[in-house]
């Protein structure tokens, strides 16, 4: 599978388009929306504990949550691993980190909070809860 990454600027807002595991372009971030980007792997026990929290965050809030497989799995293998982890939000087939100016995480899970302008405001290492992510987001968003 060819990795495709598009970076364009519209009105001063960074628009990063990456491929999802469904082979669709996904804009990260969409103007006006905060994004949560989570790095995970099937062998990561804390990731398994964290995914239900991220599923709740995705279902119960306006934050848009994305999953990035740390091992770089693609296609059917990526979809299978995401299903094994019960990920209920969009799974990206490529790492948006380089375009966001973020190095590959050294510890899993790692979660990025990305503001509507495409800037990473926080890099959170270790498992997060819906409550901790909401508290950080509210502080950054000024709620």
Q: Where are the predicted features?
A:
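A short beta-strand-turn-helix
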Residues: 21-35, 99-102
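Short pre-active-site segment immediately N-terminal to redox-active cysteine/selenocysteine motifs
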Residues: 33-35, 39-43, 107
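Conserved segment of the thioredoxin-like fold in thiol-based oxidoreductases
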Residues: 49, 59-95
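Thiol/disulfide oxidoreductase modules built on the thioredoxin-like
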Residues: 83-88, 94-138
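Hydrophobic beta-strand anchors of alpha/beta hydrolase catalytic cores
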Residues: 36-37, 65, 111
């Amino acid at each position: 599978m060819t990795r495709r990454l598009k970076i364009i600027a519209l009105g001063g807002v960074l628009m990063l388009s990456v491929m999802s595991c469904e082979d669709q372009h996904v804009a990260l971030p969409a103007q006006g929306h905060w994004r949560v980007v989570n790095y995970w792997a099937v062998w990561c026990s804390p990731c398994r504990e964290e995914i239900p929290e991220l599923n709740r965050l995705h279902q119960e809030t306006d934050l848009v949550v994305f999953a990035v497989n740390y091992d770089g799995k693609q296609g059917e293998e990526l979809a299978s691993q995401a299903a094994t982890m019960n990920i209920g939000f969009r799974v990206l087939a490529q790492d948006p980190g380089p375009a966001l100016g973020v190095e590959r995480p050294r510890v899993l899970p790692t979660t990025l909070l990305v503001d509507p302008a495409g800037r990473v405001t926080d890099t959170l290492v270790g498992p997060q809860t819906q409550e901790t992510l909401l508290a950080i987001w509210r502080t950054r968003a000024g709620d």
